[in-house]
Amino acid sequence: MLYLAAFIITLILSLIITPVVIKLSHHLNFVDQPGVRKINKKVTATAGGTAIFLAFMIPLRFFLPANQTIKGIMIGGTFMLILGLLDDKFEISAPIKFVGQIIGALILIYYGVKINFITNPFGGFIYLGIYTVPFTVFWIVSIINTINLIDGLDGLAAGVSIIAVLTLFAVALQENQVIAPMLAVLLAGSCFGFLKYNFNPAKIFMGDTGSMFIGYIIAAVSITGALKSAAAVTIFVPMLALAVPIMDTTFAIIRRIFNDRPIGEADHGHIHHRLLAIGMNQKQAVISVYVISAILGTIAFVINGIKFDHALIIFVSVILIIIYGAKRLGIFSVELPQEGCSLEDS
């Protein structure tokens, strides 16, 4: 009942706060202008992550004690909010943003949110030792950027994040965790309320303010939950729960390297672009990705309770199916054919 109460409270807060943020965004010129590479056909409020941040943070202390983990999440989350706001307003350079993400990760590590070990499938643990900090930084920054890159259509990042974090919630409950499931439902409720205004046609975008904050909290949830478990399959759980954004980002990097393009260069090869290319409208493409994410989340939940060798077979099979599907969609190509590139909502 406590988790349900937390979800409902953050949901209501998000529903109340988001319209206020929409008005403030227009007033303070936190808006996204229409453009050739943009999905919006009119000026749209951005920095919507502020609403998600407030809906998450306001009740946080009522449901969880102010221990080191929560302090780190509050301080680091606020830092990520500020970084996102600066980027949404001034479009700061990628290197500066990357350094900011590393600083955000180091804040969590300073307060004890770190990956100290990986469960050894053959028994015991593999302690990371001096590699704890770089491994944790890599994980946090990677999750931040995967959520950031999947934020390409109305409601896409928010919906995928809800599914991923609810998967981590279910797994954390299985493992009798305390902090991770509460963080998960607080974030899920915040995103769910925001989604009402972010789903197509969007009245507000989450911006980097939202995508970086959400990615940051999801990373914290995975570290304090699934990755703290003694189960041998723990590493597979967050990777499957976040498989859509993780694989989409991985494919983007591979696509750009093999085509001699800068890794940070935008293109039309992401999964949502490819779904639009085969004739789907925005809503259909987004819902299709939701369904894929939900299936992968269900698999992540199921394998958490089975033997490692069986889980490994399932995990590898899923990855191979994803790669096959990506190839069929043409995700490894660089650009979409012009005739299939319309972002019109038909």
What are these regions (language model features)?
Residues M1-T249:
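"…together with the soluble PPM/PP2C metallo-phosphatase catalytic core" -> "…together
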Residues P19-A45, F251-K283, C341-D345:
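Cytosolic, membrane-interface loops and tails of multi-pass inner-membrane proteins
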Residues V20-L24, F199, G325-G340:
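Membrane-interface capping segments at transmembrane-helix boundaries
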Residues S93, D151, M280-N281, F308:
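A helix-boundary/kink motif common to multi-pass secondary transporters
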Residues L227-A231, I313, S317-V334:
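N-terminal hydrophobic signal/anchor transmembrane helix of membrane proteins
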Residues A277-I295, I299, I303-N304:
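Alpha-helical transmembrane segments of integral membrane proteins
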Residues T298-V316:
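Extracellular/periplasmic helix-loop-helix junctions in multi-pass membrane proteins
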